[in-house]
Amino acid sequence: MLSIRNLSVTVEGKKILNGLNLEVGTGQVHAIMGPNGSGKSTLAHVLAGRPGYTITSGTVHYLGQDLLVLAPEERARLGLFLGFQYPVEIPGVNNVYLLKAAVNAVRRQQGLPEVDAFEFLGLVREKMQLMHMEDSFLSRGVNEGFSGGEKKRNEILQMLVLEPRLAVLDETDSGLDIDALKVVAAGINSQRAPARARSLVRRTRAAADSASPPRRSGPGRAASSHPPPPP
């Protein structure tokens, strides 16, 4: 599904990734681990197409396509999802409108008609129950006034509704208490399926137990990894 070969990346002239190699197959969950500054978030942002990163060498292929030539919205329509370490607020844009617009963008990419509004609300409410979220979240601005834990749950809700082929979760569990961590972990685990893959970006092993073995990120270069056993 995802193939990264000899990827090197700089930011403002400073080398962050140096010759990274990674293979992520369908049905796999990989944990990308390492201390602050080792390039974990850089890799996540490069995959999502965030500007400001210079690729000096290497290739990235996703579903057989050259990912690096695609715009961020094209990557998203192909089923690549990034869960942010620090989810941004979007005042004036309701959660339900964002979710519906995102779902319909993916459906258009697949040649499907727009989702029925009634069925869509039923789907979203089902996923919200899994995330222990009240219906009132739908009418609120995206992450506007949300606590840290609510923002992280909202990120996972987006993933549950969109059902991406590949989700890259950048320290989604960071700063959560034990109860919120259990809810977020349940949401992530509910998406495990043979046709999907997950990469969890973490500093420590404690939150990466769903991936085996972890992939450790060293000073600019990650060590090799192997596919985890089936869930």
Where on the chain are the PLM-derived regions?
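ABC ATPase NBD Q-loop/coupling interface
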Residues: 59-75, 143
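H-loop/switch region of ABC-family ATPase nucleotide-binding domains
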Residues: 203-204
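ABC-family P-loop ATPase nucleotide-binding domains
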Residues: 88-158, 162
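Helical segment within the ABC ATPase nucleotide-binding domain
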Residues: 181-194
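H-loop (His-switch) and adjacent beta-strand-loop-beta switch element
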Residues: 214-229
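Walker B catalytic motif
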Residues: 171-172
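The feature captures the beta-strand-to-loop junction immediately N-terminal to the Walker
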Residues: 33-35
